[in-house]
Structures are given as C-alpha cells and as structure tokens.
C-alpha cells in the first residue's frame, strides 16, 4: 500500500495577442512524497509541463512537452513489483476550419524507462509514437461526419511491440 505524505502543484497561463494571433503559454510543476509499506521508494512522483498554442483566424497550432517520474505498484507478484518510471512526452497538433470542413493532424511521441529496482533508472526505452489525421464535415447542427487515419508504433524494452498498428476510421460526432 502507498500513502501520500505531501504534495504540491503550481501552474501558470499567459495569454497575449501578436498581430492577428492569440498566443497562450502554459506551464506547471508538481511533486509528491509517498510512503509505501514494504520497500520504500527513493524516487517520488513529480513532473513538469509546458505548452504553447497559437490561434490565427481558422488555424490553431499547439505543441506541448512534459517530463516526469512516477511509480506503480502492480500487485504482490514478483513480476508485478513496484516499478519506477521516468518519462517524457511531446505532443503537437494543427487544426484548420474552412466553413463546414475541419482538418486535424496530431502527433505524440513518448519515451520512458522503467525499472523494478527503485531508485535506479531503467536501461532500455519503452516508446509510443502516434500520428493522427482526420477530416470532419458538419452535416447538420451538432452532427459531423468524420474520416480519419491513425498509426501507432509501440516499443517495449527497446523492441517493437505488436500492440501498435494503423487504421482508417469512419464515424460521426454528435453534440447536444
């Protein structure tokens, strides 16, 4: 079992205009101290993030970066012992609206090293790389048709994992 002894978080957002664009910058930091029964972890959970978005008319562009560490307790079995995870992620996206049509493209790239030897960073990377693109068309008020594509590449302990792949999708979104 785990108990959080203390935690804190702080963040800030700044919004400004630059010509015809509205720019938003946000950042934050959080940390916590946790005690566990059994093996005491020496690396507590914490992290930071920063992101920027810019909106110019019908075009929105955003990018963000996060870095942090945490631990998980996946159970009592030896294979599920306490695991320390140190990781980073970068996300970026672009959206363009033209009348009833919206185009979206986004990318995510995350990397982490995990270790069951708490306090010691892992030596091989787990990774998740994803790209998504979609086109939606406003069919009626509150109803949009969507056509999209996504591709995901996953690595576990430095080797390709079969949970990744690519797919086309067709759907609808509704808002009331």
Enumerate the language-model features and the residues they cover.
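Outer-membrane beta-barrel proteins
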Residues: 1-176
